[in-house]
Amino acid sequence: MTKSELIERLTLKHELPPKQVEASVKEILEQMVQSLSQGKRVEIRGFGSFSLHYRAPRVGRNPKTGDPVELDGKYVPHFKAGKELRERVDTLS
């Protein structure tokens, strides 16, 4: 599901103006990004949590030339599914 599809579904389900739903979805995502960029964890009970994981510096490889490349350490977003989400998805199999 894309952001556009989510906005469309919410618009139809709750009979709200598309612009209002779009603004709300964008604001929710922006608040999550701001929290993560400040090093905070974002938890949505029953769904999951977003946090930052540190990737240590390492020597990578340029795929085009094969030459070694020094890669700096960095923080990357990480998502861990909540128990309820894992259980609901598990019933699909």
Curated annotation (Swiss-Prot):
Q: Which keywords does the record carry? A: DNA recombination, DNA-binding, Transcription, Transcription regulation, Translation regulation
Q: A GO molecular function for this record?
A: DNA binding
Give the matching InterPro entries: Hist_DNA-bd, Histone-like_DNA-bd_CS, IHF-like_DNA-bd_dom_sf, IHF_beta
A GO CC term assigned to this protein in UniProt: chromosome
Please give the biological process terms from Gene Ontology that the record holds.
DNA recombination; regulation of DNA-templated transcription; regulation of translation
Q: Which domain of life is it from?
A: Bacteria
Q: Which family would the database say this protein is a member of?
A: Belongs to the bacterial histone-like protein family.
> What is the protein's known function?
This protein is one of the two subunits of integration host factor, a specific DNA-binding protein that functions in genetic recombination as well as in transcriptional and translational control.
On subunit structure and binding partners, the annotation says: Heterodimer of an alpha and a beta chain.
Name this polypeptide is given: Integration host factor subunit beta
What organism is recorded for this protein?
Answer: Idiomarina loihiensis (strain ATCC BAA-735 / DSM 15497 / L2-TR)
Gene field: ihfB
